[in-house]
Amino acid sequence: MSRPSTPLLDKAPTPDRLRALPEQDLPQLAEELRTELIDAVSTTGGHLGAGLGVVELTVALHHVFNTPYDRIIWDVGHQAYPHKILTGRRDRIRTLRQAGGLSGFTKRAESEYDPFGAAHSSTSISAGLGMAVASELSGEKRNVIAVIGDGSMSAGMAYEAMNNAGALDARLIVILNDNDMSIAPPTGAMSAYLARLVSGRTYRSVREAAKQVAQKLPKFLQDKARKSEEYARAFFTGGTLFEELGFYYVGPIDGHNLDHLLPVLKNVRDTQKGPVLIHVVTQKGKGYAPAEAAADKYHGVNKFDVITGKQAKPPANAPSYTKIFGTSLIEEARHDDKIVAVTAAMPTGTGLDLFGEAFPKRVFDVGIAEQHAVTFAAGLASEGYKPFCAIYSTFLQRGYDQVVHDVSIQNLPVRFPIDRAGLVGADGPTHAGSFDTGFLAALPGFVVMAASDEAELRHMVRTAAEYDEGPISFRYPRGDGVGVDLPERGSVLEIGKGRIVREGTKVALLSFGTRLQECLAAAEELGATGLSTTVADARFAKPLDHDLIRRLAREHEVLVMVEEGAVGGFGSHVLQFLATDGLLDRGLKVRALTLPDIYQDHGKPDAMYAEAGLDRTGIVRTVFAALHRDELGHEALPTPFRA
């Protein structure tokens, strides 16, 4: 299929070339950019809706500001694909999220036009403020623009940064991309006119003069003047909250109308002193009918047919882990009315949308606010409820102090279902669930579990529901289960007890999580070479099954721990126990297989696990090396001594 015709876009591969175009050409450029974006993402998959919503804004920003000298920071980065196309990366845009290709987010190592990497939300204003202050300290007149969505404004970090920026009176521009109309819709031409007016030099000069006059009035008249001025501006523009934080507010304006965007951005560029917030209203999926009609379904997409919008989804051999969690929690909630669920703006991603349909009054979406989510759940637990605080592994990092201070130290029975554990593939290192086992298992009294398959996940949901002795977590990966038979309802597992799933005599493989299937496959290969292999499912990283580990250590020559997490997790805890229990004193050969001590770039999970040595081939190779055997499993001959 031929690519769309884009004559203007072909002339503007970089922002300096874009700035050379006359303004009357920019609407056509925006349409060509939108067409190119749709075509590219249809071949790669990725985040489509957000990018379609900021096409005109992206064109306007690069036309008005002198990038890369001026800094544009895209919060989260979902909306940065048009930015990538306009900043010299169009020739690689069809490698998005592919191994060796462009990142799906902004990345400093990828381009000088990406001044700050992102993927987690609500960081742009803080980073932008740091850059703005650095510019002032260096005596430079650099513009710093942070583009943040209204969803990201639900996180406290955004307001912490705005409060600091207002206090510093820093030269910072924040563009609030309101694509859900959750703050205020535009009011047509009058709103655009007022936004243009109040961003201009004349209005601001008059306003400053009026303030100076008011300061000479008696205090009670000063207060009345201030309140009257705030009321008038709030009536027209709705910006009182941002004004109170020290920002000059402009908007709301139509983020798809270049005739409105360009003059406002120029006025702010030319007159700005302290921090300014420009409120633009956009539509997610703008310009592509299927995405406009179903914004949630086109936020993140698989490859799709541009004509029909139909996404290519491979048939599932088993239900997803996320769905198993959601349906299992519903089953437990039917038996226990104290069970409630908490999510931080990810009800669909965590499976709690299903729970919400069944129990709408027992699910709480707190927004992009993981810190609050954890402590909110702690409050529920303190009053006798059973909160399941479902957060992706990578996002739980944002609430770690609350996990320690508000949950663990008080030994409150908050349940943590940890989705997206292990590698997640195309989203890369910012979304990998690598660290939760290590940072949770370090906490005294914290129960840490990992499901090896979907049936085990169902058992762990039941176990967590019944466990009231303190905090408990269970991790599971993105994607479909392995196809095992599912019980109608899970069973309660004995805390701190694993299981043997295959008996052997020479080699022991101790798996924590869904690498169990690779361990079983490796055991078959090892058995074919005469190495009888035991395979065990640890289930628990904390408390460890000491009896099981002792048995494996005493009855086998080689013990290999396998986990889909970083160094410092399950394997480290097992090694600590082996050492303190004296089990290393008899010549046991021990190996710990973990994710490598690097941030792995995006790619396909299977290939990434193979690269890490966490597939069957890597496990077999590790056993052979421990026993000094070659790649075929034959005992290696000693190297002849040479003088």
Swiss-Prot record:
Residues annotated for thiamine diphosphate binding in this entry: 78, 119-121, 151-152, 179, 288, 370
Cofactor binding notes: Binds 1 Mg(2+) ion per subunit. Binds 1 thiamine pyrophosphate per subunit.
Record Pfam families: DXP_synthase_N (PF13292), Transket_pyr (PF02779), Transketolase_C (PF02780)
Annotated pathway: Metabolic intermediate biosynthesis; 1-deoxy-D-xylulose 5-phosphate biosynthesis; 1-deoxy-D-xylulose 5-phosphate from D-glyceraldehyde 3-phosphate and pyruvate: step 1/1
Xref: InterPro entries: Dxylulose-5-P_synthase (IPR005477), THDP-binding (IPR029061), Transketo_C/PFOR_II (IPR009014), Transketolase-like_Pyr-bd (IPR005475), Transketolase_BS (IPR020826), Transketolase_C (IPR033248), Transketolase_CS (IPR049557)
Entry keyword set: Isoprene biosynthesis, Magnesium, Metal-binding, Thiamine biosynthesis, Thiamine pyrophosphate, Transferase
GO biological processes: 1-deoxy-D-xylulose 5-phosphate biosynthetic process; glyceraldehyde-3-phosphate metabolic process; terpenoid biosynthetic process; thiamine biosynthetic process
Cofactor(s) needed: Mg(2+); thiamine diphosphate
Residues the entry annotates as binding Mg(2+): 150, 179
Described function: Catalyzes the acyloin condensation reaction between C atoms 2 and 3 of pyruvate and glyceraldehyde 3-phosphate to yield 1-deoxy-D-xylulose-5-phosphate (DXP).
The protein's assembly and partners: Homodimer.
Record family assignment: Belongs to the transketolase family. DXPS subfamily.
Protein name (Swiss-Prot/TrEMBL): 1-deoxy-D-xylulose-5-phosphate synthase
Source organism of the structure: Brucella suis (strain ATCC 23445 / NCTC 10510)
Gene: dxs
